[in-house]
Amino acid sequence: MRHFLLLLGVIAAMAIGAPAYSQYVFMDVNGDGVNTLADVLTSSSTTVHVYFDTNHSKAGATVTCTDGVHPLDMAIYDFVVHASGSGSVTYNGYTQSAVMNAAGFQQLNAFTVSGQNAGVGYIANNYANPGRYELGTISVTITGSPILTFVGTSTDPAIPSFGTGYGTHCDASVNTNEETLGIDFFDADGTRSSTPTESTTWGKIKQLYR
């Protein structure tokens, strides 16, 4: 009984106090500020909104830096996206949001297109507080039914941005003070397929183990 109670205490302590890397980056096509099955690229789509939430997981749980000391604030951001699927994406440019402009973020890595990839990066003199930010919008022209996904670490030498992540006071695990998708956090949603994953056989199986 004593060991059982001790185990419960340990689990409770972990659930309450254990910091985690669970930031969330996502795209929004229809402009409602969230990512859902409705965020599908069609020929009528002209913009894709890009968001970073530095201190919440996809599920909405509050997260903190793993060192328990430094904030998950942001002074630099980069992202790289990749187009795939049935159809094509023409990248026409990137416009940073008014919120990020007001926070003093200025272009660091110009919006660059290389084949199916595109990337951009901005930097500020001061750190934006932890939270959810609309970074900006990508202007696109769509044919068919393509999808856009985030690239964690880019291997495309033509794109100046390293990949998808942000500079912060929190000490990241590989890229110093650079929280990187696929290394330090994994919650990411691009645009959705016109055929929802849930409707396929494999998709139905995956839904059982979410």
Annotate each language-model stretch with its function.
Residues 19-43, 183-187, 191-210:
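Boundary/junction segments of secreted and surface-exposed precursor proteins
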Residues 1-5, 210:
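Positively charged n-region of N-terminal signal peptides that target proteins for export
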Residues 100-151:
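Structured beta-strand segments within beta-sheet-rich domains
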Residues 7-15:
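Bacterial N-terminal signal peptides
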Residues 148-183:
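Short, surface-exposed beta-strand/loop patches at domain edges
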Residues 24, 74-78, 147:
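Exposed beta-strand and adjacent loop surfaces of beta-rich binding modules
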Residues 34-104, 129:
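Low-complexity, serine/threonine/proline/glycine-rich extracellular segments that form mucin-like
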Residues 77-79, 136-138, 205:
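Buried hydrophobic-core signal for structured, non-transmembrane domains
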